[in-house]
Amino acid sequence: MLNSWPLAKDLQVLVEIVHSGSFSAAAATLGQTPAFVTKRIQILENTLATTLLNRSARGVALTESGQRCYEHALEILTQYQRLVDDVTQIKTRPEGMIRIGCSFGFGRSHIAPAITELMRNYPELQVHFELFDRQIDLVQDNIDLDIRINDAIPDYYIAHLLTKNKRILCAAPEYLQKYPQPQSLQELSRHDCLVTKERDMTHGIWELGNGQEKKSVKVSGHLSSNSGEIVLQWALEGKGIMLRSEWDVLPFLESGKLVRVLPEYAQSANIWAVYREPLYRSMKLRVCVEFLAAWCQQRLGKPDEGYQVM
């Protein structure tokens, strides 16, 4: 058992080093000297009896223990800020502009109505909501919060899991009456596949897993689009096999308008809130992330529900 608990200010120093990339830059952000930052990290490492950071000529890197500490520190500092907001009973309300990005399909069907409800609760906020058909750079595209259906999040961003999701193979009964249902991934190459140019997917390559292994399958067909809504309509019309998010096709599976193809296979496509600034620094960012998490979990299920595909 530890002789003492890590101090919140030391956890904050660690977070600032990770985000700024150096001890000196973290010191400038905190309004302290580099010597102060070095001292606080030494105290934190002594308290936890482990090395958190490796320093070299190329910069600073987290150790395995440091990565764990950093992830917990983000949660703890956010909880601290929430405690301060609640206990002091300050009537501060989140206000000002926040820029939110998302893909077209999920943005229209889920995030847009969520933002409408968000504004009812926090009318002092100003929201600019932008839809993209490509993977974006938060800095270059001037986005504060991006909602991504993709597990490959760059290390220089912070990601909060909103809910689990997977993409599944589907086709209309009409199509499967004309063509024999594929019995293996390899047989997909013989079918008309409706290819969607997703933000995170290589065009014409479907990566699918069954919980034990993951395979990349090259597919093609007569129809393709960068609009998931159009591809869904084509599938309903019996034009081919598509790979779509479960949230998008569930009503049609339940009604029988679509059926699963190779149901043992799926593609992991969890839904994340992605941002650069730690939540404890920004009330408006924290409020938006927490609201969207609650919204998605209420409608799509909590993060611990369902299964994780490879």
UniProtKB/Swiss-Prot annotation:
InterPro entries on file: LysR_subst-bd, Tscrpt_reg_HTH_LysR, WH-like_DNA-bd_sf, WH_DNA-bd_sf
Keyword Transferase included in the entry's annotation: no
DNA-binding region positions on the chain: 23-42
Coiled-coil positions: none
Keywords: Activator, DNA-binding, Transcription, Transcription regulation
GO MF terms, alphabetically ordered: DNA-binding transcription factor activity; sequence-specific DNA binding
Limits of the HTH lysR-type domain: 6-63
UniProt entry tagged with the keyword Transcription regulation: yes
Any GO BP: DNA-templated transcription
Alphabetized PANTHER family for the sequence: HTH-TYPE TRANSCRIPTIONAL ACTIVATOR TTDR-RELATED, HTH-TYPE TRANSCRIPTIONAL REGULATOR
Annotated family: Belongs to the LysR transcriptional regulatory family.
Task performed by this protein: Positive regulator required for L-tartrate-dependent anaerobic growth on glycerol. Induces expression of the ttdA-ttdB-ygjE operon.
Annotated protein name in UniProt: HTH-type transcriptional activator TtdR
Organism: Escherichia coli O6:H1 (strain CFT073 / ATCC 700928 / UPEC)
Gene: ttdR
